[in-house]
Amino acid sequence: MAVPAAAMGPSALGQSGPGSMAPWCSVSSGPSRYVLGMQELFRGHSKTREFLAHSAKVHSVAWSCDGRRLASGSFDKTASVFLLEKDRLVKENNYRGHGDSVDQLCWHPSNPDLFVTASGDKTIRIWDVRTTKCIATVNTKGENINICWSPDGQTIAVGNKDDVVTFIDAKTHRSKAEEQFKFEVNEISWNNDNNMFFLTNGNGCINILSYPELKPVQSINAHPSNCICIKFDPMGKYFATGSADALVSLWDVDELVCVRCFSRLDWPVRTLSFSHDGKMLASASEDHFIDIAEVETGDKLWEVQCESPTFTVAWHPKRPLLAFACDDKDGKYDSSREAGTVKLFGLPNDS
């Protein structure tokens, strides 16, 4: 059964910095021109602003493909959609209908008006922001925790707590295929070419299936412990995985080899996001900061301070703006302010 990363303890490595790197990780010498340029940008754009979205903690944030809207899914059983106006998020609508927590959501890859939510109520719902209505409710067999939309827009894959992944036709809203796995399935994703399907699992492996045949292609031993999350870079060159060992590993898509690791976090890596140009990778955990690294060197580019563990991060598809949401469960902070907010980093300091 898939286990939320929040339930995991600190890294077995227990250290950050080069000393905790796996043997195959490499350290570069001196910051690149890109790193220096982005650091200069963030020095003037290091402001984080928070926006009230929900009445309980936010589990998932995602941008529409055109970057005009940000959606969030929450423990309060709703989704919210914001419009990005200059340097602020303006709440557009709240989407109700689920009977349990909205654990993950994603947008259609090329239609900026459609998004889909996965819930513990054993359904997924497709929403249209133009009508603000649910255009389809699809019943599934279990409590849903992971969802992704295929790059060609034709299929939605949803994973549940019982390690079943269901493939749903995005037009007919009917199940096309269903796979029961014998291992703990964590995050799921197609590759950018739409011809392979990737799963991260509780044994530290990345399982790759052909698509649409769903035949096993390869299993990669990526990490010594639970492999939690996976993201593909928009350029199609790399994918990254995050693990309970607190490491992020970067993989060459074509060669399926690990090219570098990022080891500045101490806790299980719960969420990853590549910037629109594929040059930055944000990773977050129960550490009270989000690490922003240069993809090509692994160098630290910036860190975003947080007051609590981070559930979800998402780079804007066109700008160096990072949306994220944190956990308020420890109650150390003013819960009325902290609960249910989405945060936006990269805003001008004088905004």
UniProtKB/Swiss-Prot annotation:
GO CC field: nuclear speck; nucleoplasm; THO complex part of transcription export complex; transcription export complex
WD repeat residue numbers: 53-94, 97-137, 139-178, 180-221, 222-261, 264-303
Coiled coil: none
TM regions (residue ranges): none
Keywords recorded for this protein, A-Z: Acetylation, mRNA processing, mRNA splicing, mRNA transport, Nucleus, Repeat, RNA-binding, Transport, WD repeat
Keyword Nucleotidyltransferase (UniProt): no
Sequence positions bearing N-acetylalanine: 2
Domain of life of the organism encoding this protein: Eukaryota
Example of a GO biological process term: mRNA processing
Entry-linked SUPFAM superfamilies: WD40 repeat-like
Molecular function (Gene Ontology), one example: RNA binding
Region (Disordered): 1-20
Principal location class: nucleus
Record flagged with keyword Repeat: yes
InterPro entries: G-protein_beta_WD-40_rep (IPR020472), Tex1/THOC3 (IPR040132), WD40/YVTN_repeat-like_dom_sf (IPR015943), WD40_repeat_dom_sf (IPR036322), WD40_rpt (IPR001680)
Localization: Nucleus; Nucleus speckle
Pfam families for the chain: Beta-prop_THOC3
Complex and partners: Component of the THO subcomplex, which is composed of THOC1, THOC2, THOC3, THOC5, THOC6 and THOC7. The THO subcomplex interacts with DDX39B to form the THO-DDX39B complex which multimerizes into a 28-subunit tetrameric assembly. Component of the transcription/export (TREX) complex at least composed of ALYREF/THOC4, DDX39B, SARNP/CIP29, CHTOP and the THO subcomplex; in the complex interacts with THOC2. TREX seems to have a dynamic structure involving ATP-dependent remodeling.
PANTHER family: THO COMPLEX SUBUNIT 3 (PTHR22839:SF0), THO COMPLEX SUBUNIT 3 THO3 (PTHR22839)
Family label: Belongs to the THOC3 family.
Role according to the record: Component of the THO subcomplex of the TREX complex which is thought to couple mRNA transcription, processing and nuclear export, and which specifically associates with spliced mRNA and not with unspliced pre-mRNA. Required for efficient export of polyadenylated RNA and spliced mRNA. The THOC1-THOC2-THOC3 core complex alone is sufficient to bind export factor NXF1-NXT1 and promote ATPase activity of DDX39B.
Protein name according to UniProt: THO complex subunit 3
Record organism: Homo sapiens
Gene label: THOC3
